[in-house]
Amino acid sequence: MKSIRISSDYRAKRDNASCFDETFLKSFAEELYNAIIEIIKENKTIIKNEVRDELRNELATKEDILLVEERLGKKIELLNQKIEREIKLVRRDMIIINLVIILAMYAPEIIGKLLIFR
């Protein structure tokens, strides 16, 4: 950090003056203000660089996003295959249920005919 430098001219005036005159105080305040502004500017760039580095470390990179996208794509494909299998099983079950319902109406006739042929 930069130290605030008070010029020897100001020190001499301060040491010789019994009280500070207005122009001395104004010029001293202006120099102090400029020194503070300079320190703030230097710290601003340091803090900005630190924040940028911190964000770089914390945020996901394009490679990270592509890896996640690839993993999600594989999971979605597996889920699609499982859903298709389930749909096929449900269709099969629906066909079986419909056949049972249809044949249940004719079940006594079918059983009777089967018994007669024996």
UniProtKB/Swiss-Prot annotation:
Subcellular location: Membrane
Keyword Transmembrane helix listed: yes
Bilayer topology term: Single-pass membrane protein
Keywords noted in UniProt: Membrane, Transmembrane, Transmembrane helix
Keyword Membrane in record: yes
GO cellular component terms, semicolon-separated: membrane
Membrane-traversing stretches: 95-115
Family in the record: Belongs to the M.jannaschii MJ0023/MJ0349/MJ1072/MJ1074/MJ1107/MJECL16 family.
Protein name: Uncharacterized protein MJ0023
Organism: Methanocaldococcus jannaschii (strain ATCC 43067 / DSM 2661 / JAL-1 / JCM 10045 / NBRC 100440)
